[in-house]
Amino acid sequence: MARRGLLLVLLALLALPIFSQTKYALVIGLGKQEDRAWPKINGDKDVPRVRQMLRKGGYDKIISLVNERATKRNILSAFNTLVGKARPGDIFYIHYSGHGQQVADPHHDEPDGLDECWIPYDAYKKACARDRGERHLSDDEVNYYLGQLRDKVGDRGKILVVIDACHSGDATCGDEGEEVLRGVSEVFDATCHFAEPIPRAVSRRKERWITISACTSAQSNAELRNPVAGRLTYALWQILSDQSSMSNAELERRIRRFYQGIRSRVYQTPVITGEYKNLQRISDFLR
């Protein structure tokens, strides 16, 4: 009997690595750019709040890329690191606070002829000798790495992407003083393919994760003035820091209420998308 009990304990211990879930995070925040033509924003100020929220939610494997460290090379390296570490059932939180920009699609695989891009530290606002498009981080590239993560973690794994940016807008807006917007309306005219072309069959995969965006594609994303922060980032920090469990519909309602309480001329609506949005609770990523 004792021998059988010992055997059961050993089997349970052996099974632990199979069913354990490790939490990983990549947090990118930009308030500075190599190209000074970009409007000044404060995405770097979001990082401490995001890290605090993640630590409270049990994340101890966090990669933070802020300002000068958030080059395209470093961001791709971080994605490769996460893919290399991913195991079935693992949990991944990806956060981007910074500018967004649309780029004339060099691969001709977008219906509207435009790629939506995150703006790393070394990306330029206009095409030039230093950046012909290869320093922008396209949605195809981001989706490629997220797809690789999903392949590794399987259906039991969790992937959440938070985008506190937008791909349109101007530097300032409104009659009640300046409002800082993340994103520019000017389309970048890429003169070359991106550094790492992504096969169309891979880049066009379905959104096999959950994405929370600060606004719709037709809206601008304005920062908070006091405290200085991204609207979506601060809303999530306030709503999810107490680790309450709630449906994604309830979370979206609370973010909308938070937005409505802001005195601003910029109207924006949070958006939750992805195949897993009705299968996994966002609040559970931080519990």
Per-range role (PLM):
Residues 1-2:
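N-terminal secretory signal peptides that target proteins for export/translocation
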Residues 20-22, 74-97, 102-176, 246-254:
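Caspase-like (clan CD) cysteine peptidase catalytic core
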Residues 5-17:
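Bacterial N-terminal signal peptides
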